[in-house]
């Protein structure tokens, strides 16, 4: 029996203002949610907290993986940097810090961090979500 291995990806990225270099929440800039991703060529996009998340279709080869990554990223670039009079840019930093006043103004649901549910591999008990 042949086993076929596929590879995918689901990275998160942040959005910044090109004028102030401050982070901007993706929650009202792109479609899709964790529960209802917005399907695009090569995968899907969705909001994950304040970040923009994308995932790609399972890929059987390096070229298919890179092609799917390019297609979905191109879609995100068009939605973020191609709109809003190009005042926003995609930021691949691993973390984002928001101005306190701006963060306080965001809806409560975009401030929730972590996976639902998240379990401790050793105790098999559910972890408490991190605080913001």
Q: What role is predicted for each listed range?
A:
Residues 1-132:
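Phosphate/nucleotide-binding catalytic core
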């Amino acid at each position: 029996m042949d086993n076929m291995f596929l590879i995918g990806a689901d990275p998160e990225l942040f959005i910044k203002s090109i004028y102030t270099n401050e982070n901007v929440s993706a929650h009202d800039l792109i479609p899709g949610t964790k529960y209802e991703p917005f399907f695009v060529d090569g995968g899907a996009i969705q909001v994950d907290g304040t970040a923009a998340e994308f995932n790609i279709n399972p890929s059987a080869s390096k070229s298919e993986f890179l092609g799917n990554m390019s297609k979905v990223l191109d879609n995100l670039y068009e939605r973020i940097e191609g709109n809003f009079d190009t005042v926003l840019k995609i930021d691949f930093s691993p973390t984002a810090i928001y101005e306190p006043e701006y963060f306080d103004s965001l809806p409560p649901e975009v401030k929730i961090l972590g996976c639902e549910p998240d379990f401790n591999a050793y105790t098999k008990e559910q972890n408490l979500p991190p605080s913001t």
